[in-house]
């Protein structure tokens, strides 16, 4: 015999290749797969094994078949003999011949219901014929479920026989189902109850059931028995949760969930978080320079940095907060230049909270002033050490001892007099005593043991923020802990974004900054508020969600604050008499000036008149500001910003009053005077025209000539002018020359070109706007 493959053998014997392989393995013959060959010896063994298996499988099958049918050839032979013997007897009912068959049927399924044989119509045939007929009937019915009747039933009995067949099959299945259902399934053993569950705020019945390893229906029943009606998705309060858990004997612990959208709480938790002492490193001290106006704060910082910041300020007064970092003896010190006059009280108080050391600058020739006292109170409230810098000791009328004597009244006693306050006499103008002052700062910082963890996500505060036309929202941040990197997802106050670029105080781009370092960043979606906290999160999605949530909450709070008058309290306002109220909209170039001006206006106390600031923002005055002012009958105050041409036209149409200022004292005095007398000023500024700079020409001994195109109104020779760049006033002065072609001109109307030079100003650039104005005297009403 030739070799046979496994799959061929399986196909020939109508079995699967898998079974053939298993049979060969049982015989100890290893084959790889269905393509393997079987030799003759293995084939004989496999045939014997397969034949034996088939015989064993056929034996019970035949036995079952014989039991079910009851008409197999073996058992029917005696019946055939009996029927042949009994068939010779006359008038014997044919139905009696079925008794043995009926007995056999009872072993299987339910017997078929046989009608009595019709003996009257039965033909009296010979015994041989009956025997032959009986044998024929048995042979025909041996394989039928309803067989066994020697008298073949007629056509009327066939449906009945079919019914018996179907009933037999169904009854067998039902019996099998009953046998299976009689064995009840073993219920799963419930899990043990936990010792304690932890929840925050509330839980639904389904959530509580999951924590207790119980079915919700069981909890609903228990709650109902305890007097609480609840559904599976209903939230349970703390009392209901404690009630059901007490019934089960389970302890309950409520987890206090920290609202990450509350940056102040989140900031304090992160700042006070316990860290490994080995990760802490020494950080530079953050120093705030405070004092009375014109006592030399900016000059002191200017001397330290060898810069000329003071020259760029209007009237010699610092209008913006700046942050700078110096390096002395291989150690860094971060300075915050906090403006000193009373208008910046809020900014100074906020600055005191983010700094470590306060330098109180007091002029030796002026002594203690109101802002000096205010700065002392802020520093003491923040619990910061104070170093007194007695400035202007180079002046002949300087009297440092008088300053020291006056400060003792405020618990600032010099070390020379037995106190613990460091006094450092300096001359910021000539640089005298500065090195000693810096040494004192480093000494105090060593005593304070200022440390931070740079190996964490950065947190800190906003020093300043503004809207830049080219870069968008720009914020100056002070990193208080951690390290800030480019690309970090950040939430700053009610704004969010990703840090796109960072510039340090020297104007250089950096990729990361550590603790106590000021840095200017871009990439926020809006301008934050000065003094806002900032936190770096792990992903941008979280930062976006928190920022949007905070912005929406702030908007809702702002709307609710501006709509405090309702039907409930309207009558009370009416009984109080006619309420005089001045609505004010403040627009400034930077956020710090906005807050300072707003804080100053709120302090104005005029009997019968209240100040209500309905809107503050950074940037030029636009049409939306005019629309808001017209709807709320408000006055617009612009600080270092100008209205756009469209906004000015809208203001004239809506009769909206716009007051523009560059020095904050003048704005405060004007508003206070208007509130006291409710009178218009004696002089009113009138804008007569605007011109756009198209080209600039530098001429020696003349300066910069601006080639302009008059876009609105007219430019006159005797008018005052302002140079506006990106909506911000960069210079204010007078026209030196106004020419049309090469001839001098008294005025140039709209639509014409002209050449303009401005007195004492040559930094004119293309796309600047030259605004011409005159002061008109008007009558008091």
Swiss-Prot record:
Q: A Gene Ontology CC term for this entry?
A: cytosol
- Where, in this chain's numbering, is GTP bound? 291-298, 337-341, 391-394
Where found in the cell?
A: Cytoplasm
Say which domain of life the source belongs to: Bacteria
Q: What are the Polar residues biased-composition ranges?
A: 66-81, 115-126
Q: Which InterPro entries match?
A: EF-G-like_DII, IF2_II, IF2_N, P-loop_NTPase, Small_GTP-bd, T_Tr_GTP-bd_dom, TF_IF2_bacterial-like, TIF_IF2
Would you indicate the residue range of the signal peptide?
none
Keywords in alphabetical order: Cytoplasm, GTP-binding, Initiation factor, Nucleotide-binding, Protein biosynthesis
Region annotation G1: where it falls in the sequence:
291-298
Q: Where is the tr-type G domain?
A: 282-451
Bias-annotated ranges (Basic and acidic residues): 53-65
Transmembrane stretches, start-end: none
Chain spans, region G2: 316-320
- According to the record, the residues making up region (G5) are 427-429
- Ranges for the region named Disordered are 44-195
Where do Low complexity bias regions lie?
A: 82-93, 127-169
**Residue numbers spanned by region G3:** 337-340
Q: Which family does it belong to?
A: Belongs to the TRAFAC class translation factor GTPase superfamily. Classic translation factor GTPase family. IF-2 subfamily.
Q: Any idea what job this protein has? A: One of the essential components for the initiation of protein synthesis. Protects formylmethionyl-tRNA from spontaneous hydrolysis and promotes its binding to the 30S ribosomal subunits. Also involved in the hydrolysis of GTP during the formation of the 70S ribosomal complex.
Name recorded for this polypeptide? Translation initiation factor IF-2
Provenance organism: Listeria monocytogenes serotype 4a (strain HCC23)
Lineage, top ranks = Bacteria, Bacillati, Bacillota, Bacilli, Bacillales
Q: Which gene encodes it?
A: infB
């Amino acid at each position: 015999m030739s070799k046979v493959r496994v799959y061929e053998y399986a196909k020939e014997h109508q079995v699967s290749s898998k079974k053939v392989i298993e049979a060969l393995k049982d015989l100890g013959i290893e084959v790889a797969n269905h393509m393997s060959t079987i030799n003759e010896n293995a084939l004989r063994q496999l045939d014997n094994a397969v034949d034996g298996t088939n015989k064993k499988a056929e034996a019970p099958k035949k036995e079952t078949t014989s039991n079910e049918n009851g008409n197999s050839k073996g058992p029917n032979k005696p019946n055939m003999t009996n029927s042949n013997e009994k068939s010779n007897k006359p008038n014997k009912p044919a139905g009696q011949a079925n008794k043995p068959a009926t007995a056999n049927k009872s072993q299987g399924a339910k017997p078929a219901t046989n009608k009595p044989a019709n003996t009257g119509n039965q033909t009296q045939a010979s015994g041989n014929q009956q025997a032959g007929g009986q044998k024929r009937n048995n042979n025909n019915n041996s394989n039928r479920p309803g067989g066994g009747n020697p008298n073949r039933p007629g056509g009327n009995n066939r449906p009945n026989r079919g019914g018996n067949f179907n009933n037999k099959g169904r009854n067998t299945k039902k019996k099998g189902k009953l046998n299976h259902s009689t064995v009840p399934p073993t219920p799963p053993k419930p899990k043990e109850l936990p010792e304690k569950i932890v929840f925050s705020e509330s839980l639904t019945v389904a959530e509580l059931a999951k924590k207790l390893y119980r079915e919700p229906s069981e909890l609903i029943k228990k709650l109902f028995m305890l007097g609480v009606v609840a559904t599976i998705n209903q939230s349970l309060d703390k009392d209901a949760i404690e009630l059901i858990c007490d019934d089960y004997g389970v302890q309950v612990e409520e987890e206090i969930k920290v609202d990450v959208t509350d940056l102040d709480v989140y900031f304090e938790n992160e700042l006070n978080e316990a860290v490994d002492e080995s990760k802490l490193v020494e950080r530079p001290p953050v120093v705030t320079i405070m004092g009375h106006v014109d006592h030399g704060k900016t000059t002191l910082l200017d001397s330290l940095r060898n810069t000329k910041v003071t020259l760029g300020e209007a009237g010699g007064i610092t209008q913006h907060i700046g942050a700078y970092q110096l390096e002395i003896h291989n150690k860094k010190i971060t300075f915050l230049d906090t403006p000193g006059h009373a208008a910046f009280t809020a900014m100074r108080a906020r600055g005191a909270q983010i700094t470590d050391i306060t330098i109180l600058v007091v002029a030796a020739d002026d002594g203690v002033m109101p802002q000096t006292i205010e700065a002392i109170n802020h520093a003491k409230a923040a619990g910061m050490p104070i170093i007194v810098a007695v400035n202007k000791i180079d002046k002949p009328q300087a009297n440092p001892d008088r300053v020291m004597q006056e400060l003792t009244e405020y618990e600032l006693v010099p070390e020379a007099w037995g106190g613990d306050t460091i006094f450092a006499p300096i001359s910021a103008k000539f640089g005298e005593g500065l090195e000693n002052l810096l040494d004192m700062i480093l000494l105090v910082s060593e005593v304070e043991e200022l440390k931070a963890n740079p190996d964490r996500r950065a947190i800190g505060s906003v020093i300043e923020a503004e809207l830049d036309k080219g870069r968008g929202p720009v914020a100056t941040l002070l990193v208080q802990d951690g390290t800030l990197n480019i690309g970090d997802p950040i939430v700053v106050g009610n704004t969010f974004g990703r840090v796109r670029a960072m510039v340090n105080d020297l104007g250089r781009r950096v990729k990361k900054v550590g603790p106590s370092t000021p840095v200017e960043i871009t990439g926020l979606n809006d301008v934050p508020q000065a003094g806002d906290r900032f936190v770096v999160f792990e992903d941008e999605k979280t930062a976006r969600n928190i920022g949007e949530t905070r912005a929406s909450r702030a908007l809702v709070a702002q709307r609710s604050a501006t709509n405090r008058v309702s039907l409930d309290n309207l009558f009370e306002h009416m009984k109080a008499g006619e309420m005089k109220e001045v609505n004010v909209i403040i627009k400034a170039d930077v956020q710090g000036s906005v807050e300072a001006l707003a804080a100053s206006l709120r302090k104005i106390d005029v009997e019968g008149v209240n100040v209500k600031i309905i809107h503050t923002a950074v940037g030029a005055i636009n049409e939306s500001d005019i629309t808001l002012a017209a709807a709320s009958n408000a006055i617009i105050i612009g600080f270092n910003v100008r209205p756009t041409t469209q906004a000015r036209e809208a203001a004239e149409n809506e009769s909206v009053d716009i007051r523009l200022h560059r020095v904050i004292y003048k704005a405060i005095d004007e508003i206070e005077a208007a509130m006291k007398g409710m009178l218009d000023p004696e002089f009113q500024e009138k804008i007569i025209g605007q011109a756009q700079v198209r080209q600039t020409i530098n001429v020696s001994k003349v300066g910069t000539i601006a080639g302009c195109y008059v876009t609105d109104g007219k430019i006159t020779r005797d008018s005052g002018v302002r140079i506006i760049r990106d909506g911000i006033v960069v210079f204010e002065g007078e026209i030196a020359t106004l020419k049309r072609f090469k001839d001098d001109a008294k005025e140039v109307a709209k639509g014409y070109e002209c050449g303009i030079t401005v007195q004492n100003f040559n930094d004119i650039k293309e796309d600047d706007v030259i605004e011409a104005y005159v002061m008109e005297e008007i009558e008091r009403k």
